[in-house]
């Protein structure tokens, strides 16, 4: 989903800052709900994602980038924002953080046993990463996710044992 319109000129500005090949095409990516994401087709045949952070301030995005790099440095495969010519990993444009990310050509995670087992292995690897400074103890994606889930469960009578466990963990 796109909340911020991105022109070919906007995309070219970011690509130029990263020293990347010229832009051939740009199209919105489906599936997001809090940011604007676009697939960029480059002249050398490669593809990148241009992400405009609509729900976080540039300062929050900078912190998120630091955490993402920390996780990657500790061996967890995760798309790290590309470094721009000035060493930064984002560009602030019209008060919003803009970045380029590697495009991962893959679908959504399947719900079969092998896929879920693979997910569990990656989650275990993630949990083995030492905690870095500044890591938040709350989780949100443009809103307070857990609190909203609990309110919804109350309103709809949709509590499950897993949600109750999350609720207990969230008040610790």
Residue ranges and their predicted role:
Residues 43-136:
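ATP-binding pocket architecture of kinase catalytic cores
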């Amino acid at each position: 989903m796109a909340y911020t319109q991105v022109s070919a000129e906007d995309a070219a500005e970011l690509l130029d800052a990263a020293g990347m090949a010229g832009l051939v095409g740009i199209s919105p990516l489906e599936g997001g709900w809090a940011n604007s994401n676009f697939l960029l087709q480059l002249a050398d045949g490669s593809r990148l994602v241009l992400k405009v952070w609509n729900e976080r301030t540039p300062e929050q995005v900078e912190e998120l980038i630091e955490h993402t790099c920390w996780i990657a440095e500790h061996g967890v495969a995760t798309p790290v924002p590309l470094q721009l010519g000035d060493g930064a990993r984002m560009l602030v444009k019209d008060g919003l953080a803009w970045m380029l990310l590697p495009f991962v050509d893959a679908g959504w995670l399947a719900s079969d046993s092998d896929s879920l087992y693979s997910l569990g292995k990656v989650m275990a690897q993630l949990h083995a990463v030492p905690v870095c400074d500044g890591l938040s103890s709350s989780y949100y994606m443009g809103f307070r996710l857990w609190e909203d889930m609990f309110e919804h469960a109350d309103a709809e009578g949709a509590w499950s044992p897993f949600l109750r466990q999350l609720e207990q963990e969230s008040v610790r």
